[in-house]
Amino acid sequence: MFDRSLASFLLPAQILMAKLLAISSFWKAAGMTRFSTLFQKPKPVIAMVHLGALPGSPLYDAAAGLEGLLSAARADLMALQAAGIDAVMFGNENDRPYEFQVDPASTATAAYVIGQLRAEITVPFGVNMLWDPRASVALGAATGAAFIREIFTGTYASDMGFWAPDAGDAMRYRDRLGRSDMLMLFNISAEFAHSLDQRSLPDRARSAVFSSIPDAVLVSGQITGEAAALSDLEAVKAILPDTPVLANTGVKHETVADVLRVADGCIVGSSLKRDGD
């Protein structure tokens, strides 16, 4: 016999689950659509423009000053665009030691450099201020970036200490700044760090997509320039067939074909530079 009391409990739960699954499917499809709409081609290659060490960093070259930073960034940008790269991303990889809260002077200087180059950028561009989601959002909003990259989810033990970024805060901050159109690329395997989450990388990726609605998921190696394991890319892509999955580190000319056989794109930095610098 039909148990009305049980049904009154189960049916709302089933409806709620159906709604949650529908929302998840919507955001997966939206993420792939936003990603493909931005890049306009399959499997984009995004090249890094590594800014020189910025003011506030111990490695900043005060003698060369802002003009030195601008000149170096312009040279990299022009070379990459002339070579036919699909997109570029400006980042502060040289601001070592890294911080979880970037010096405002560094973010302001990055905005100045990108602003000076803005009219010369002919491809989609993104930004990343390591390892500060809010600074990355602010820089992206100020410069008109099409996308940002950061660690937005998870809990880590790292060279910089314990680390627990807040995706909800970063995404709401982006929207408050009027840039809900700016894509958020989630690095789910942080360099220089070890996840304290006992779940597998694919499970963490799937959870991040459901809970934090990224536009793409990035898989990294242990440090800058070290390749993500192809098996990790395969496992994450298998569990996220409807979400863009990119290789974030260590892609080289001799491996890019194998990487793009699995991944939906890649980010390339060191391997495009003379002596990796």
Features from the language model and the residues they span:
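N-terminal small/glycine-rich loop or linker at the start of catalytic domains
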Residues: T37-A64, L177-F192
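Hydrophobic faces of well-ordered beta-strands that scaffold small-molecule active sites
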Residues: V45-V49, F90, F125-V127, R149-E150, ...
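Glycine-rich anion/phosphate-binding loops
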Residues: A63-A75, M129-D132
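Glycine-rich, proline-tolerant flexible connector loops at the mouths of alpha/beta enzymes
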Residues: A87-A108, T155-S158, V217-A227, G276
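Alpha-helix-loop-beta-strand connector modules within alpha/beta enzyme cores
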Residues: F100-G126, A167-M184, A228-A247
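Catalytic cores of alpha/beta
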Residues: D132-T143, V251-G265
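Conserved anion-binding
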Residues: A141-P214
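Glycine-rich phosphate-binding active-site loops on the catalytic face of alpha/beta enzymes
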Residues: A146-M160, L218-I223, A263-D277
